[in-house]
């Protein structure tokens, strides 16, 4: 689990998943159960989580898809306690559900379609 761009008031929660589609389904199920809206993008995600995905471990980044972050206008004024709290709740629910699962809900494998893309992304 990786977090990037958390705390923006404007925008929506996006779970960037580099892994099997079943990972996306499970994360959406957890988000729904937490009452926190999120969308999922099943793709190579430009984040620190790629180092895990590259080694075959399904990876996820929680991203707040909004405006102004990672730009010259990026200031603390763009952060929202409400948004940060919701991100923390969602991450906590995901960690709790997956960490306490009697049987882990998906395999530790990477879809073939991502393996070549990850090699290229990591300049291998």
Predicted regions and their residues:
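Metal-dependent peptidase/peptidase-like ectodomains
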Residues: 1-66, 72, 82
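His/Asp/Glu-rich mid-to-C-terminal helical/loop segments that flank catalytic regions of hydrolases
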Residues: 67-124
């Amino acid at each position: 689990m990786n977090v990037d761009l958390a705390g923006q008031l404007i925008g929506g929660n996006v779970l960037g998943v580099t892994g099997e589609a079943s990972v996306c389904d499970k994360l959406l199920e957890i988000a729904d159960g937490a009452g926190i809206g999120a969308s999922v993008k099943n793709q190579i995600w430009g984040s620190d989580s790629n180092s895990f995905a590259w080694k075959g471990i399904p990876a996820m980044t929680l991203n707040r898809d909004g405006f102004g972050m990672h730009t010259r206008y990026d200031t603390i004024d763009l952060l929202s306690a409400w948004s940060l709290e919701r991100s923390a709740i969602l991450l906590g629910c995901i960690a709790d559900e997956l960490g306490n699962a009697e049987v882990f809900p998906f395999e530790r494998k990477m879809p073939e379609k991502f393996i070549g893309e990850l090699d290229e992304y990591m300049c291998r």
